[in-house]
Every structure is written in structure tokens, then in C-alpha cells.
């Protein structure tokens, strides 16, 4: 009798779901479970419903109750992994997906591999994430999350410097972006890819499309400011760069990167006081960024405050000893000081080890070696 009543309430729950009456559906499933706590059907229905409503903690409880009855149910391990993933519990998500792959009779399930792709992406293992997402596209080209997969692959390809493939992904979803993203968000990504390719004209055009829709888009204003700062473009203009960065800071005054880029623009104009003020604002907001301290060192070097320059370079190196630019600038500083040629050589040598293909470092190192050799 209890089994019959449980089945009856489960059917009522199914009907309520069809009518999108989620609260009553959950109530009916709970009634079903009171009459039969081991009903796989009712447990699965309520777990799936909770997961769809982003009540992942509840969903996990119900999925685990099923697995206590059917430990080898791969169809349950897969959505359990998704719930753990949505709660940022990556270790348990990884375990659940492993169990799903082991127990599913056919592991070629697009939802499963979609989740695995996101898991790898969260772990920073972008090569494995790319493989998983590509597998989903082969399994089901019309998968419900296909536009999100294209977006994620676009980001991954950009990180891998596969810029043409990245652009293909972003263009594919330009007019149908995954929610909550909009067409403007995709134009921003397209602009950023073009910028990485040093296609500055195309990057500017893409960013301006974003700005036409949202004139206070802080990140786009920041990117445009940096583009106008570039010396090797047809539209290079420091005053325009400063204007864009100032507008960006009005929209988001807490962005350390915008303050830093503003300082770089003032340096290009040799306006050292303004540059110093901007750099100070940057390090106030992010004191552990080695690039900020390197640029402060360059500023001090330009105004002949060598001791302060050394302190700034030393701080940058303590934060990250693997940036060739800092070692090169340190070498330049030592070269300017009397009786520190060997220190300069050591710094240039370290810069060369970190960036062996850089011709400027190599030329400077060779010239200093010759100069030191001839002076002996």
C-alpha cells in the first residue's frame, strides 16, 4: 500500500513539474518519500528539481541517498559532480565525475563532459578543459549549453595564443551569446583578441562598438586608453589616452591597473609629478604587483634618484624574480653608477637567461662584456 501511495504522489509531483509549479512538486515528492524513503524515482526527481533551482546543497543530500542504495549508479554520480562543482567543491566534484565515468555503461554523455570541462577549467588545466569541451561539441552539436562552450573555448584559445580559433568561437556566438552575457560582452572579447594580435585598428573598432552601447564601460575605456598610448599605431595620441583612462577611473576609481596605465602615459609625456601620483594610487590599491614597482623604479631612474630606483627594483624582484624587464632595468641602473659594472653584467645576464630571444638584452650584454674586456 505504501509503495502505491508513494507512486501516486510521485506522479502528482511529475504533473506539478509539467505545470512549472515547483513548490507543490517538491511537496508531492516529499510525501512520496515519507511513504517510501527508498523510492529511487522520487529521490531522483526531487534531486534534479533542486539542482535545477540551484538548491545544490539539498540536491546533494538526495543524490547521496540514492547512492547509498545504488552505489554504482553512474547516472547519479554525474549530476552529483555537477552540484559539487556549482558549490566550488572541486575535490568532491572530481571524485564524483570519476565514479560516473567508471560506472556509466556509455560515458559519452555531453552533460558529463561539459561538467568535466568546467572542472578542468576551474583547476586551470586548460588543455584538458579544451579536450572535454571539444568532445561535447562532437557528441552533440546542438547541446543546450553549446554557446557557453564556444565562449569558454574562445577564452581558452586566447590563453593558448590560438587567436584565430578564439576569434572563430566569439564570432560564432556574437548574435547568440550565452546568458547572462550580451553581444557587447562578446565584442569586448573580440577586441581583446585583436589587441593580443597587435591588430590595434581592429581592436579599437571592436572596443568602440562597446562604448557606443555603454559610454561608461570602465574596462573598455581602460583598454582604449592603453591602445592610444601605443607608439606604433596610426592613432597614437597620449592626451587622448589620458582622457580615456581618466574616464575609466571616474567609472571605477578602485582599479589599480587604470592608475598604473595612467602613470605610464604621463611618463611618455615626461610629466613625472603626475606619473608619480598615478603610480602611488596604483600601489596603494595593489602593493604586490611587481610591474608597478618596476615602473616606479624607471621613474626614479629618469629623475636621477638612483637609490630610490634601486629600492623599487629590489621590491619588484622580491615579489617576482622572473621578470626579465626588471633585471634589464636594474642592469641599466648599475651601469649608470660608477664601479658597478660587474653588478650590471650580472643583472643583464639574469635578464638574458629569462628572455634569451630578446635582441636588446643580448646586444647590451655583449657590448658591456666587450667594454669590460677592453678596459682590463
Language-model region placement:
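TPR alpha-solenoid repeat register
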Residues: 8, 42, 76, 110-112, ...
Amino acid at each position: 500500500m505504501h509503495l502505491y501511495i508513494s507512486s501516486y504522489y510521485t506522479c502528482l509531483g511529475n504533473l506539478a513539474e509539467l505545470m512549472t509549479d515547483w513548490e507543490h512538486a517538491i511537496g508531492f515528492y516529499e510525501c512520496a518519500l515519507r511513504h517510501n524513503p527508498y523510492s529511487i524515482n522520487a529521490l531522483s526527481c526531487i534531486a534534479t528539481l533542486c539542482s535545477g533551482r540551484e538548491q545544490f546543497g539539498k540536491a546533494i543530500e538526495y543524490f547521496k541517498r540514492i547512492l547509498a542504495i545504488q552505489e554504482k549508479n553512474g547516472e547519479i554520480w554525474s549530476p552529483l559532480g555537477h552540484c559539487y562543482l556549482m558549490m566550488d567543491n572541486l575535490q568532491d566534484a572530481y571524485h564524483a565525475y570519476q565514479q560516473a565515468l567508471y560506472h556509466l555503461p556509455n560515458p559519452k554523455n555531453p552533460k558529463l563532459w561539459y561538467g568535466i570541462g568546467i572542472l578542468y577549467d576551474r583547476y586551470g588545466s586548460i588543455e584538458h578543459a579544451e579536450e572535454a569541451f571539444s568532445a561535447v561539441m562532437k557528441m552533440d552539436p546542438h547541446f543546450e549549453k553549446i554557446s557557453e562552450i564556444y565562449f569558454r573555448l574562445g577564452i581558452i584559445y586566447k590563453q593558448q595564443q590560438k587567436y584565430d580559433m578564439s576569434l572563430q568561437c566569439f564570432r560564432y556566438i556574437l548574435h547568440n551569446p550565452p546568458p547572462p552575457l550580451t553581444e557587447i560582452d562578446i565584442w569586448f572579447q573580440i577586441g581583446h583578441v585583436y589587441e593580443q594580435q597587435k591588430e590595434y585598428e581592429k581592436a579599437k573598432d571592436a572596443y568602440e562598438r562597446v562604448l557606443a552601447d555603454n559610454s561608461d564601460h570602465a574596462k573598455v575605456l581602460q583598454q582604449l586608453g592603453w591602445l592610444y598610448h601605443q607608439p606604433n599605431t596610426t592613432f597614437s595620441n597620449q592626451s587622448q589616452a589620458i582622457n580615456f583612462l581618466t574616464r575609466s577611473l571616474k567609472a571605477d576609481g578602485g582599479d589599480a591597473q587604470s592608475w598604473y596605465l595612467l602613470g605610464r602615459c604621463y611618463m611618455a609625456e615626461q610629466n613625472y609629478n603626475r606619473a608619480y601620483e598615478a603610480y602611488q594610487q596604483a600601489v596603494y590599491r595593489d602593493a604586490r604587483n611587481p610591474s608597478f614597482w618596476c615602473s616606479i623604479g624607471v621613474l626614479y631612474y629618469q629623475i636621477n634618484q638612483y637609490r630610490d630606483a634601486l629600492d623599487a627594483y629590489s621590491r619588484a624582484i622580491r615579489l617576482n624574480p622572473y621578470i626579465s624587464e626588471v633585471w634589464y632595468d636594474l642592469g641599466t641602473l648599475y651601469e649608470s653608477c660608477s664601479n658597478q659594472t660587474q653588478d650590471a653584467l650580472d643583472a643583464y645576464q639574469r635578464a638574458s637567461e629569462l628572455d634569451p630571444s630578446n635582441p636588446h638584452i643580448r646586444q647590451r650584454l655583449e657590448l658591456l662584456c666587450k667594454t669590460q674586456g677592453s678596459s682590463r
